Amino acid sequence: MAIDCLVLGAGQEIGKSCVVVTINGKKIMFDCGMHMGCDDHNRYPNFSLISKSGDFDNAISCIIITHFHMDHVGALPYFTEVCGYNGPIYMSYPTKALSPLMLEDYRRVMVDRRGEEELFTTTHIANCMKKVIAIDLKQTIQVDEDLQIRAYYAGHVLGAVMVYAKMGDAAIVYTGDYNMTTDRHLGAAKIDRLQLDLLISESTYATTIRGSKYPREREFLQAVHKCVAGGGKALIPSFALGRAQELCMLLDDYWERMNIKVPIYFSSGLTIQANMYYKMLISWTSQNVKEKHNTHNPFDFKNVKDFDRSLIHAPGPCVLFATPGMLCAGFSLEVFKHWAPSPLNLVALPGYSVAGTVGHKLMAGKPTTVDLYNGTKVDVRCKVHQVAFSPHTDAKGIMDLTKFLSPKNVVLVHGEKPSMMILKEKITSELDIPCFVPANGETVSFASTTYIKANASDMFLKSCSNPNFKFSNSTQLRVTDHRTADGVLVIEKSKKAKIVHQDEISEVLHEKNHVVSLAHCCPVKVKGESEDDDVDLIKQLSAKILKTVSGAQIHESENCLQVASFKGSLCLKDKCMHRSSSSSSEAVFLCCNWSIADLELGWEIINAIKLNH
C-alpha cells in the first residue's frame, strides 16, 4: 500500500500549513492555513495541486485542523465557501469554539481597517464552522469504512492536537504544532506508542535546544520592569490565545510580589472572549491550573485591565498586550507606530515571527526605520527585546518524540530550510530513520508495511513455553523484543488468519496426515563371502553404525535393525523397487526406509553399512 505526502504549505518555511496525505487513493488534508507574511496569491496553499477540476469533494476524504492559529486554519473558510469543499472537517472542541473568533478578527483587521480584498466574509466563516465535527481526545473516529482518525493532546495552545490516521495497514501521525514541555497554563504533548509508517513533524526550532524556562522568565520580567521603572511603555505583541495568557499569569504574579502599581493592559475585544473560553475549557489546561481552579480562577488577573484606544497617547508608564503577535497588522502594529520612536519604550517579542512581518524585521536586527504595508516608515528608537516563550517544541523535543514513536519514515515541515536540513541529518544518523524535507508543491512517496492480524491456537501458545521461545529480559514490553516460535500461519478464504501448532494442521485443514519417507535397498555383503547367519550380519552392521554415528540407539531383531525413524531389514527379493539397477546380483541387501525428519541420519547410516565401505 503506497503513501504519498504532498506538501501544499509549510514546506521549508513557516506559514500556511497544509499537508495532503494519500493512502491507497484516499486523501486526507491536515490543516488549511494562510501565510501571515504574504498579501498576494502565495497567501493560500495551491489547492489546484489536489484537483485541477476543482472537484474537491471527490478528491478529499476529510480535513483535520490541529489548532486555531491562522497559519493552520486561516484558509479554511476560503476552501469550503469559495472553492466549494463540503466534505467532513474535524477539529477539537476548543478549536471549533475559538477558530471563528480568530478568523473574524483577522478578517476585520485586514478588510475593515486595511482595506484589503475580502477573500472570505463573516457569513463564509459561519457557514464553514457549521460543517465542522468536534472530536474529543483519544476518540477514534471512523471517517468511512476504511479510514479512522484519533486526536492526541499536543500542548502548544488550548485545544491543539496531534492526529493519528490509520487506513488498513498504513498508519501516520501529523503533529501540527506541539510542545514537549509543560508551561504555566498548558501541559506537555501526550501520545501513545504507535506503529507508524510515517511521522510528519513540525520543526520550527529544528536546531534550538532551550534550557530552563526560569532564566528566560527572569530576563523578560527584568526588561519590562526596567522599562516601566524608567517611565516607558512596554508593548508585548502576542496572539490573544495562548502566549498572552501565559505571560499575563507571569506578569500578574510578579506585579503582586513586587507591589508594582504600573497598569497592565490587554487590548479589548478578542482577548476578553479568549479568557472566557479559557475558563470554560479548563480541562484542556495544565495540571497546575486545574488545581488552582479548585480555589480560584487563575485567569482572573488582579493587575490586568482592558485598554482603551485613548490611552495610546496617555502619559506615564504602562504594559500593553496587543494582537497580533507578529506585528503584521491590527492593533499591535497601530500602537507600535506611536510608541516605537521613543527611546524610553520597549517592544518585547515573546515568540517566533514569520518572514515578511514587522516582528521578523525587528528580530533580524535592530533597524532604525521599518517600512509598513502601506509605504509608511516608522522610526525605531525604542528598545527591542526578544525572549523565547514559544509554545513550540525545541530540537530535543522533536528528537524525543521521533525516538519514542520510532516511525519508518519522517517528513519535516513548518521550519526554516537550513535548520531543517541539519535536523534531517541528525534524525537519519542518530535514529537511523529516513527523513525528508519537501518544499511546497513536492510529493514524497513511501511504501507501507502490510501486517496480518492472526489469532493463536491454544496448542501453539502452550508450545511457546518451550526453550525455543525466547522472551525479552526487559520488564516492560517493547516493540523491538525478539520473540521466536515455530508455528504455521493459516489464512482462510475470508482472510481470517490463525497461527497453529504443526500437529494441528490436518485438523484445521480437514485433511489426513501425510508422512514423507525415503527408501533405499543397500548392498551390505557379497554372497558366499562368509557363513554368517542373519543375526550375525545384523550385529556386524550395528557395529559399523556405532563407529560412524556416535551414541546411536540401535534396536536389533533377527533380520532387521532400527535407529530413530531409520529401519533396515534384510531383503530377500531378487528385484526390489528401491534397489539400483546397477547393483550386483551377487550381493546381500538391506532394504531401508526413514522419515524425512531424519534425512541426514539416514544417509549417514547408508554410507556406513554399504558394501565396500
UniProtKB/Swiss-Prot annotation:
Gene Ontology cellular component list: nucleus
Under the heading InterPro entries, the entry gives:
Beta_Casp, INTS11-like_MBL-fold, MBL, Metallo-B-lactamas, RibonucZ/Hydroxyglut_hydro, RMMBL
Where does motif HXHXDH motif map? 67-72
Q: What happens when the gene is disrupted?
A: Embryo lethal.
Write out the coiled-coil annotation as residue ranges: none
Q: What EC number(s) are associated with this protein in UniProt?
A: 3.1.27.-
**Expression by tissue:** Highly expressed in senescence leaves, petals, stamens, pollen and late stages of siliques with seeds. Also detected in roots, stems, leaves and seedlings.
Q: Name one GO biological process term.
A: polar nucleus fusion
Subcellular compartments: Nucleus
Q: Where does this protein chiefly localize?
A: nucleus
Family the UniProt entry places it in = Belongs to the metallo-beta-lactamase superfamily. RNA-metabolizing metallo-beta-lactamase-like family. INTS11 subfamily.
Function statement: Component of the cleavage and polyadenylation specificity factor (CPSF) complex that play a key role in pre-mRNA 3'-end formation, recognizing the AAUAAA signal sequence and interacting with poly(A) polymerase and other factors to bring about cleavage and poly(A) addition. May function as mRNA 3'-end-processing endonuclease and also be involved in the histone 3'-end pre-mRNA processing.
Q: What is known of its domains?
A: The HXHXDH motif is essential for the endoribonuclease activity of the CPSF complex.
Q: What else is known?
A: CPSF73-I and CPSF73-II are not functionally redundant, but both are essential in plant development.
Subunit arrangement?
Component of the CPSF complex, at least composed of CPSF160, CPSF100, CPSF73-I, CPSF73-II, CPSF30, FY and FIPS5. Interacts with CPSF30, CPSF100, CPSF160 and FY.
The identity of this protein, by name, is Cleavage and polyadenylation specificity factor subunit 3-II
Q: Which organism is it from?
A: Arabidopsis thaliana
